[in-house]
């Protein structure tokens, strides 16, 4: 996701402008002018920092917008650095990547990007957050598979997107099952315990897969296309919002891609669960509108081998002229037309996947 700024309502009815930085491996919140803050259980934001071990350290000073600051705040901020150090950002992202990707720092690649391909999609609900949209299985199956999908202003399905971008080389079929009811509340899976990542997010995938198997909704062997004993990929749409959306609950899960390598319970039906990706049911941070194809096409891009092209440490807010912005789905393009119309893959992205052979200029 791109860094985003929004107004957060506080318990006393006042509002604070906050800015969200980072990605699934490392994210943090600042004031509008760049000082790191974090919300305590009382609902208010306090100035904070990360210790060398990545744990969050709060001050006792509540944060306000620059024009409303107290003398105590102003004096403290005069000797306080903005944001986080580049070393902390780099180290924390590496730790987060190591945990989410099971120690593999390389870009994930779980699916061979050619031919017809069945991909498993599981819809999952939390104990305290259920699906809001009606007929979720049918709704998601249509959004992912129906040629020319046009609900809610959409301009095509996810399958359309990949067929078009690959020039017909890759034709995915998304097999949707569920919803299944997870054993824990949303906050268990989405809790941010350190600067690095949500430690229980991968367990959400394991739980969803185990329940789907127990209920007879899926035979995981059917999703091992090359018979190597490893499921090609699992995609989970979880109920509610994405933490990456400006203003969404901080205990929500951040949409991401990773691996279940080495996790307990990752062998089902005699095959191993490995690469996965996940994102939310709803778009934005309020309302009950179903997401568009932008986020799944972004996260599935990781499954095909693509890296993020947006600013991930948040130091400069992602406003570098070197980045693709809305012209790349691996940058800010997944949000084009409210997530309904992601841009075509760039030449660089198609070359990375293998759908295009770049011509070397002499």
Name each model feature, range by range:
Residues 1-271, 275:
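Zymogen propeptides/activation segments of proteases
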Residues 233-235, 239-362:
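Extracellular hydrolytic enzyme modules, especially secreted metalloproteases
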């Amino acid at each position: 996701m791109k860094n985003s700024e929004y107004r957060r309502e506080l318990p006393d009815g006042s509002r604070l402008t906050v800015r969200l930085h980072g990605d699934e491996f490392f994210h943090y919140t600042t004031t509008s002018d760049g000082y790191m803050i974090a919300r305590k259980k009382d609902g208010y934001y306090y100035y904070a920092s990360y210790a060398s071990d990545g744990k969050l350290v709060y001050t006792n000073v509540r944060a306000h917008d620059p024009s409303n600051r107290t003398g105590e705040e102003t004096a403290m901020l005069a000797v306080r650095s903005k944001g986080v150090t580049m070393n902390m950002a780099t180290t924390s992202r590496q730790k987060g990547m190591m945990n989410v990707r099971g120690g593999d720092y390389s870009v994930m690649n779980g699916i061979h990007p050619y031919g017809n391909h069945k991909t498993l999609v599981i819809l999952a609900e939390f104990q305290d957050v259920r699906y809001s949209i009606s007929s979720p299985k049918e709704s998601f199956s249509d959004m992912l598979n129906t040629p020319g999908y046009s609900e809610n202003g959409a301009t095509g399905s996810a399958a359309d997107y990949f067929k078009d971008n690959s020039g017909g080389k890759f034709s995915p079929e998304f097999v949707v099952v569920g919803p299944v009811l997870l054993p824990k509340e949303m906050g268990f899976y989405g809790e941010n315990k350190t600067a690095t990542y949500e430690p229980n997010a991968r367990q959400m995938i394991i739980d969803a897969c185990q329940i789907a198997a127990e209920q007879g909704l899926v035979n995981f062997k059917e999703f091992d296309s090359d018979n190597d004993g490893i499921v090609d990929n699992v995609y989970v749409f979880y109920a509610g919002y994405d933490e990456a959306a400006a203003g969404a609950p901080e205990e929500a899960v951040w949409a991401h891609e990773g691996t279940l390598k080495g996790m307990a319970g990752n062998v089902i039906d005699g095959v191993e669960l490995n690469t996965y990706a996940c994102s939310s049911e709803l778009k934005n941070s309020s309302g009950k509108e179903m997401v568009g194809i932008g986020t799944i096409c972004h996260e599935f891009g990781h499954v095909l081998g693509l890296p993020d092209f947006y600013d991930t440490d948040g130091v400069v807010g992602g406003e570098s002229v070197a980045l693709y912005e809305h012209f790349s789905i691996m940058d800010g393009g997944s949000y084009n037309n409210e997530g309904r119309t992601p841009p075509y893959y760039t030449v660089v992205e198609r070359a990375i996947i293998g759908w295009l052979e770049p011509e070397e200029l002499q």
